[in-house]
């Protein structure tokens, strides 16, 4: 029982926000690509596969991140009690866990077409080099965005077995979304990060955080408008984006206090709701 508890803690499965932020772009890409005039069984099946894949790969990514960061985590108040940093789980055991999770994720992946499988495998280096970026650049959140939103492109390919401008624009927009919300998240640890020498966009833009996050979210919002235009969505889609705009611009940014770690966590977690809102936006565009 204790081992199960440690495994859940290690993989953050008790904190669904992580894998949901990985899953939402997958669902967006799947929804925008799918023909809802056809039977829905495939849509539900692929949605389930992408959810499972998100959970498995997020879990594996957390383990790799904790292995790489174990010496840093020991020095940060919020992370010092993580299983690897605290010595409750050995690095050897953690590596075995990550291989098992990747193996299970591959079993999920082989349900898709060959193009999707190939593109997914090509993204693996991105997924496992991200934890190193905070040592070398102030832009680790950018690399997280590139990695976390790759599923949007994969989902499109899984339906169409090809790619065009729509998922590419949406993908780049979603990268800015992640860049924004993970910058907010980073302000929880900014004091410790500055002491131990870890880099982040939170540190780089600490003097103008709202301006930078606003630019990120505006870029994401503009990508939604462009996608709607390219997809020939009706006016109902663009009207529904008002809710998305208010969530990003007013709820998340207007009253944001980056010096308040609890508020930063709340604003960060609210992006799970934002993911749902954008999904509904796309459904409106596709169906209504």
Task: Give residue ranges: language-model regions.
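Cytosolic, membrane-interface loops and tails of multi-pass inner-membrane proteins
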Residues: 1-7, 62-89, 183-206, 254-263
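Multi-pass membrane catalytic core of lipid/isoprenoid biosynthesis enzymes
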Residues: 49-54, 70-120, 176, 195-238, ...
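Membrane-embedded alpha-helical segments that form the functional core of polytopic membrane enzymes
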Residues: 23-27, 31-68, 78, 102-110, ...
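Alpha-helical transmembrane segments of integral membrane proteins
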Residues: 5, 17-21, 41, 45-49, ...
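Membrane interfacial helix-start motif at the N-side
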Residues: 5-18, 88, 134, 200-213, ...
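Small-residue-rich segments of transmembrane alpha-helices in multi-pass membrane proteins
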Residues: 20-30, 83, 144-157, 204, ...
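Extended hydrophobic alpha-helices typical of membrane-associated regions
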Residues: 222, 226-288
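Intramembrane alpha-helical segments
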Residues: 4-9, 28, 59, 79-169, ...
């Amino acid at each position: 029982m204790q081992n199960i508890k440690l495994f859940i803690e290690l993989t953050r499965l008790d904190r669904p926000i992580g894998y949901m932020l990985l899953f939402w772009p997958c669902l967006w890409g799947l929804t925008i690509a799918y023909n809802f005039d056809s039977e829905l069984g495939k849509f539900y099946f692929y949605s389930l596969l992408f959810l499972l894949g998100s959970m498995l790969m997020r879990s594996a990514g957390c383990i790799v991140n904790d292995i790489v960061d174990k010496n840093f985590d020991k020095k940060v108040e919020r992370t010092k009690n993580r299983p690897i940093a605290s010595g409750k789980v050995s690095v050897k055991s953690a590596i075995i866990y990550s291989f098992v999770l990747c193996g299970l994720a591959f079993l999920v992946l082989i349900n898709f077409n060959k193009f999707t499988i190939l593109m997914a495998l090509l993204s693996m280096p991105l997924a496992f080099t991200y934890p190193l970026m905070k040592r070398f650049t102030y832009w680790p959140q950018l690399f997280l965005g590139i990695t976390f939103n790759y599923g949007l492109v994969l989902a499109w390919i899984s339906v169409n077995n090809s790619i065009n401008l729509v998922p590419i624009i949406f993908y780049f927009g979603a990268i800015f979304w992640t860049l924004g919300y993970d910058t907010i998240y980073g302000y929880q640890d900014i004091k410790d990060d500055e002491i131990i020498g870890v880099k982040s966009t939170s540190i780089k833009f600490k003097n103008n955080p709202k301006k930078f996050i606003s630019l990120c979210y505006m870029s994401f919002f503009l990508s939604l408008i462009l996608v709607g235009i390219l997809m020939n969505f009706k006016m109902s889609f663009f009207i529904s984006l008002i809710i998305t705009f208010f969530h990003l611009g007013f709820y998340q940014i207007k009253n944001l206090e980056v010096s308040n770690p609890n508020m930063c966590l709340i604003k960060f977690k609210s992006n799970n709701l934002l993911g749902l809102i954008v999904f509904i936006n796309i459904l409106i565009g596709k169906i209504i």
